[in-house]
Amino acid sequence: MYKVGDIVQCFVTGFKEYGIFVKIDNNYNGLIHISEISSDFVNNVKEYAEIGEKIYAKVIEADNNAKLLKLSIKTIDYKNDGKERKEKEEKKQEEK
């Protein structure tokens, strides 16, 4: 079972103009809506990932009965480790 705030590893399975579809595990699927991809304007969701690519996403809504997750990559390092971007930026500032 997943809960809001969890960071999940997932694999990109498809695209629609409104978002990125992912598979989390054998039971769960998810959608990263276009509004949860970036704080900047997103013209084409395909610019952010590729089919089959492993990414990380943050759970913003979970329907554990239907095994569907609404996900966000807006504030995390979705290509690497799924950690909040702000934390990484703060650490870089501290190192200077």
Residue spans of the language-model regions?
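Single-stranded RNA-binding regions, centering on S1/OB-family and related RNA-binding modules
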Residues: 1-96
